[in-house]
Structure formats: C-alpha cells, structure tokens
Amino acid sequence: MKKLTSIIAIAASIAAADGINAQSTEKHTQNPWTLVYDGAITKNEPGKVNIHPVTYKLNGIDIAANVYTPANYDASGKYPAIVVAHPNGGIKEQTAGLYAQRLAEAGYITMAADASYQGASGGEPRHTDNPAYRTEDIRGMADFITKYAGVDANRLGVLGICGGGGYTIKAVQTDKRFKAVATLSMFNTGEVRRNGFQNSQLSTIQERLKQATDARTQMVTTGKIVYAGVSSVKDEEIAKTSTDLYREGYLYY
C-alpha cells in the first residue's frame, strides 16, 4: 500500500506541475529522441536520469520503447520499476514519456512503449487500438522490464494514462507480477466506444456495429481498410467540437 500511495502521489504532483500541458508537436524536431514534453531529456549525462531506446518482440511484432534509468544508475543494483501505458492515440514521446521521466527522477527504472500497431512499433493495419492488444502490450512491457539490468522484479508497478488506464486495470486483474497500480484520467474505452461519450450514442449502437462489421468484411474481401473519420478531421471541424475532451484530444494527438 505504501508503494501504491507513492506512485499516486508522484503522479498527482506531476499533473499539478506548471507547464504539463504546454507540449507542442513541433518540439519533436528539436529533441534527439523526439520527446515533446516540457523538461524532456536532451542528452544523457553521468549522474542524471538517462533515456535508453530499446526494441523487443511481442507476438511477432517489433515494439519500440524508451527505458528511463534514475540518477547514478547501477546495473548491479535492485530498483523498483514502473511501466507506463499511453493514452488512446498517444505515443511514448508524449505524456507517457513525461511521467516515465519524472518517476525515474524519483528513483524508479521506468518504461514507456508505443502500443502494437502504433507509433514506432510495428503491426498492420496502422493505428489499430484493440483493447485485447493494448492489454497484451502492458504485459509485454512487464516481460521486458523485469529482465532489464538492475530491476527488482518483485517491485513492479504500472501507471495507465487516459485510455491506457482502462487497459491497465484489465491487465492487473490477471497479471500478478504487478504489485502496485495507478491510473490518471482513466478512460473506459469499451463503455465510451459502445455508448458514446456520456451515453450520447445509445440509440445508434446497432447501426455502428453494422458499420464495423461491414468494414471488416470489406477488409477481408478486398484488402481495403476503412479508417475512423477522426484520422482526417480538419481544424475547422475541431474548433466546432463541443466536447472539451474530444476537441483538446484532436489537437494533442
């Protein structure tokens, strides 16, 4: 319980920090690891938190991730570790990386990975966000980080952000390697995709299921992939979006 409280307290302090939302998509060109959050590491220095890009296989897919090691990291030591699951539509260089870096500053070995089919990770069709895959991604991060030099596998935690929070809760229900869990702005993807935001689409559930079925049939029979409409949304459409959550999400992701 003490460790759980620690993760939550650290996450809350990060969220309250000034400038946490002052992230720009233009920053990726200015950082050697394409990190876009304020205060991101710009170079690895002795005695400080360092970042280590890594890749590994998960069910035949190449996964791209960043591991953050705490100041004065000693590979022969025993450190608690935390993996961070990014939001729906997010990548490891955004808010997941921010929290991973800040938690490393608190003494943890941390990890943020691009989900399968997303970011720099492999998998087709691109941008697939399947709850079963996302849950498996979290287990895959645990597979990797528990073998990382210096990690105490008996002190493993997980932080899930937004959509990653919902997938995190699902993962820890059955994966008992995780000894602590915390979420931030947790988003129930299944409920919202089914019912709409705040139950705004209850009347169209069957219609949308038919659209999903037709899209799958088309992919199987013709090879053509139907992507969700948000992939081509225009700035003027974003400005007209009445729900703050979606409007700000379009801009950020």
Predicted regions and their residues:
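Glycine-rich nucleophile elbow surrounding the catalytic serine of serine-hydrolase chemistry
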Residues: 160-170
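Conserved alpha/beta-hydrolase
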Residues: 102-122
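N-terminal cap/lid segment of alpha/beta-hydrolase-fold proteins
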Residues: 29-77
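Short beta-strand element of the alpha/beta-hydrolase
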Residues: 76-87
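Alpha/beta-hydrolase fold nucleophile elbow
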Residues: 149-162
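Alpha/beta-hydrolase active-site loop
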Residues: 128-149
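The serine-hydrolase catalytic nucleophile loop
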Residues: 89-101, 115
